[in-house]
Structure formats: C-alpha cells, structure tokens
Amino acid sequence: MSLSALHKYRLQYKPVLPKHIADIDNITIEEGAKTQSAVNQKELSELFKHTYGLPICNIVAGKNADIHRVIRCGFILSGGPAAGGHNVVAGLFDGLMKGNKENKLYGFRCGAGGILSNDYIEITAELVDKHRNTGGFDLVGSGRTKIETEEQFATAFKHITALKLNAMVVVGGDDSNTNAALLAEYFAAHGSDCVFVGVPKTIDGDLKNQYIETSFGFDTACKTYSELIGNIQRDAISSRKYWHFIKVMGRSASHIALEAALETQPTYCIISEEVEDKKMTVSQIASEIADIVIERHKKGLNFGVVLIPEGLVEFIPEVKALIKELNNLLAHKKEEYSKITEFSAQKAFVCENISESCAATFKNLPDNIAKQLLLDRDPHGNVNVSAIETESFVSGIVKAEIVKRGIKVPFTPVHHFFGYEGRCAFPSNFDSTYCYALGYTAFILLALKKTGQICCISGLQKPAEEWICGGVPLTIMMNMEQRNGEMKPVIKKALVEIEGKPFKFYQSKRAQWASAEDFVFPGAIQYFGPSEVCDQPTKTLLLEQN
C-alpha cells in the first residue's frame, strides 16, 4: 500500500490516555450497587439469569493482581465501519502488552461471521502500527452476521473455547452489543470463564444514554458531512439559483442531521423526531419549507440548503401507517401482486387493498417514491427505507406545494446523499483519542474479569487527561422489542430529545437561519494546529454536557 503524506503523519499521532487509567499497576475496580433495566425487568432477568443486575464498574486507584494475568483475547468489528475502530484495537493491544507480554490478541474476520467460520488472524505489533489512527475496519473487516440460533451459539462456544480465549471484545452498535450481552450470558450459563466486553460504535449517534456520552465515529462522520455541506453552501451563495436537498445518514435517529445543522447553519433542517412528536403530515412538511422558499424569494434569495435525515419517512405518521399496511399487503398477497407489471395497475391494486386513509396518502406521493415503496424490499419483505430517495421526495412535495399556491417562484432543486463518505475517514483527533481510551478501558475490564459490560467514558467535553473510564452492564440499557414477530431483548436506540439542549438551541436559531444568509463553513477536519481547531468534540456533546 502506498501512503499519502497525511497517512504517514497520522501513523505517528500519539493519543493521550486519561490519567486515572494510565498506570495499570495502581488501578482496580470499584463496583456500584446492583442495577436493573428501565423497563421489562422481569422478562430480562429471566433471559439473563447469570448477567442481569450486574453493578456499574468504576476504575479507581488501588491494586489488583489480575491486571497482569495471562489473557488470550479475541475481538470482532461488527456492523458498518466507523472512524476510530483501529484505535480501539490499538488501545486494546497496547493494554494487553503492558499487562503481560505473554498476552495474545486475535481478530475474527468480518464480524461475528468470522467466529462462526473460525476465520481469525493473530494481531501483531507490526500489524497494529500500520493501522494506528486510520479510518475503516480493514484490519480484519466487518460484517453484519448475528449470532441468534442455538446452533450458532454452540458453534461460537466451540470455536472460542478451542482457541482457548478467556476474553472477547465486541466493537459495534446497539444490535452488536445486544449480541455481546447474549454471548456473555450464554458463556456464563455454560460454565465458561470467557469475559465479554462491548465497545460503543455507530456514526448514527444513537447508542448513547446517561452512561455513554457518545458512540465513536459520530464525531468524524459529522465533521466530514459538515465539510461537504459547507462546500455546497458556498456554492449556493455563489450560484444563487439552486436549492440543495441533502440527505444524511441516520435511519433511526436524526443526530447526524442535527449536529450537521449546528455546525453549518443551513436554511432548514428536518428533525424526524419533531415530525413524529408534532404528528406532522406530508402536506405540513411541504408547506413549512415552501413558506421559506417564498419568503426568501421576496428578499432575492432564490437558493437554500435543506438537511434531511435518512429515516424521515418512517417518522411521518401517515407514511409510517402506509408502510405498515404495504408490508402486510405485499406479504400476504405477494403471488397475486407479482403478476402485475404496469405501475398504474400496481398502484390501483394497492389502493384497493389498503385502508382509505393510507390509499389517499399513497395517491398523493410522487410516482418515483411510490414506486420505491413497492419495488425496494429488504430480505424480510419489508420496505427498504434506506433505499428511498428521501431528498427527492421532500423537494418533490415542496415543488408541488409551490405550484398549488399558484406563485411563480424560481425553484431548482439539486439532490445529494452523504453516507458512506463519513464512515471511513481518517478519525478526528477526538475519535482517535476516544477510541484508544475505549480500547484501553476494554483491556482493564476484561483483565479484571468484568463480563457483560460495555466501556463508558465520561467528561468528554474536558481534556482527554481528565476523562473518567469504566464499565456499565449491557442489560441496564435493554428493553424488549418485537423483531420478526417475536419479542426480543435489544439495546434501546437513543433518539433526538426534542426537550434536549441541542435541539432547543437549533430551534432557537431556526427562523434566523431560514430567513438570511447565515451559513457557516467548517472546512475539512484539521489534525494539526490550535486545539480549538483540532481537538473540539461535537457541538451536540458540548451542549449536552455543559
């Protein structure tokens, strides 16, 4: 592999460790009181007989001989890549080597699938050094395989036991860490001493709570998207004739859209959670944006930038109801529907077989969106929401609203989707440092035999030296949700809180940004220079923690 000049410099970057975990000879774990989940306590306690109710683990000053015990540790990188994953591995590896030179680290290839296929590599110092502070998950690859069936759990147990592993780290989002909790329970129930620890990863930012201030990768992804949005905003005020509709990743939550809005001050940003809370209709969304387009036209501002979260359509009550009925219809009448080839006939068939209210919603959708709702199905037969061109949908309904009003306004929409661009960028200094500390924390938790925990670090708005590290039981974050027709234990996703400080701040600025040229241009992620340019966390985190 040929290296760019930046790549060479990033390999040399030395993340700062929080002071209180830097000296492993003088640390131990202080356990808090027993814990419980916020909801579904009875169901979860029955499913996790050996790991439910574990205490929170605080890393404190003290002595613990187990820190130097011999560890054979495995890990997986699970789900979509997020910037900083390689530094989690680097922190874990460095901790293991400091604990005992006899320690071993193995990476299973392509996520949990590598555990099931027994496909792994030994991680060496040379291999780690080639990946420090780099983006992506290419060190061992990632995957979305879940360990769900009894046969799969037995296979995982067989392969992990055969490799004589006594520790496993699962780097992933809510689903992956749910799997980590289930594996911790399975191994404990079968008498294994293998310790399972999770690490919070997701660019979507929806794996957070009172214990986890942010998931890694969110910082880098938001800054990457914000650079691109800023570039487009500069183009908008240069050309002065385009309305840019930009979809950003975030199917289940609008954290990325909100953070990007806080960083760039666009003309308008839709927040899915607000749409759901206000029970906004398609017509109301169109009307709100059309009002802005028309008012800006009166000021000679025939341009603008609108940010849209990827999962918007699932938060619009009438469209959500339509999707549910479409899923049921196309599941139960799949054979009958498959014989219809013309879209007009498909549309008529659908409207005849769903409720009157949903039929009205379906008829009012732009044809390209209606077709996507019918044609794009996921492996479970459901509408593939992430494939819907939401940005085109929004600009389409806005254009229709302007036409309906009979007002002649220049309106030339341009569409963008920023997704994969943010997943594998060189991690920001924040993510590089945060991930290294997460990996080091994972080492401490597994060395001190604290299974069923997920790494957590608090005080992230402060300098890294002052961060406080520890572990929180995975089961404390769980609830029961319906998945594929069955109630399953899952870690609850964190949505944007409309009463939270980040949204309230945006809400206070929204009218000002909509009516004027008030764009901000963040520029590219900076790695060298003043701390206020290079090391600042997201505005979301600063607003939440200050």
From Swiss-Prot:
Mg(2+) binds at D174. The record marks K201 as: Important for catalytic activity. Keywords: Cytoplasm, Glycolysis, Kinase, Magnesium, Metal-binding, Transferase. The record marks D175 as: Important for catalytic activity and substrate specificity. The keyword Transferase applies. Its cofactor is Mg(2+); Mn(2+). Substrate binds at T202, I203, D204, K241, Y242, M249, G250, R251, E310, Y420, E421, G422, R423. InterPro entries: ATP_PFK, PfpB_PPi_PFK, Phosphofructokinase_dom, PKF_sf. One of its GO terms (biological process) is fructose 6-phosphate metabolic process. Pathway: Carbohydrate degradation; glycolysis; D-glyceraldehyde 3-phosphate and glycerone phosphate from D-glucose: step 3/4. One of its GO terms (molecular function) is metal ion binding. It is found in: Cytoplasm. It is an enzyme of class 2 (transferase). One of its GO terms (cellular component) is cytoplasm. It comes from the Eukaryota. Optimum pH is 6.4-7.2. The keyword Kinase applies. It catalyses: beta-D-fructose 6-phosphate + diphosphate = beta-D-fructose 1,6-bisphosphate + phosphate + H(+). Non-allosteric. Competitively inhibited by PPi, Pi and fructose 1,6-bisphosphate. Its EC number is 2.7.1.90. Diphosphate binds at G80. The active site is at D204 (proton acceptor). HAMAP family: Phosphofructokinase_II_Long (MF_01980). Catalyzes the phosphorylation of D-fructose 6-phosphate, the first committing step of glycolysis. Uses inorganic phosphate (PPi) as phosphoryl donor instead of ATP like common ATP-dependent phosphofructokinases (ATP-PFKs), which renders the reaction reversible, and can thus function both in glycolysis and gluconeogenesis. Consistently, PPi-PFK can replace the enzymes of both the forward (ATP-PFK) and reverse (fructose-bisphosphatase (FBPase)) reactions. Belongs to the phosphofructokinase type A (PFKA) family. PPi-dependent PFK group II subfamily. Clade 'Long' sub-subfamily. This is Pyrophosphate--fructose 6-phosphate 1-phosphotransferase. It comes from Entamoeba histolytica (strain ATCC 30459 / HM-1:IMSS / ABRM). The lineage of its organism: Eukaryota, Amoebozoa, Evosea, Archamoebae, Mastigamoebida.
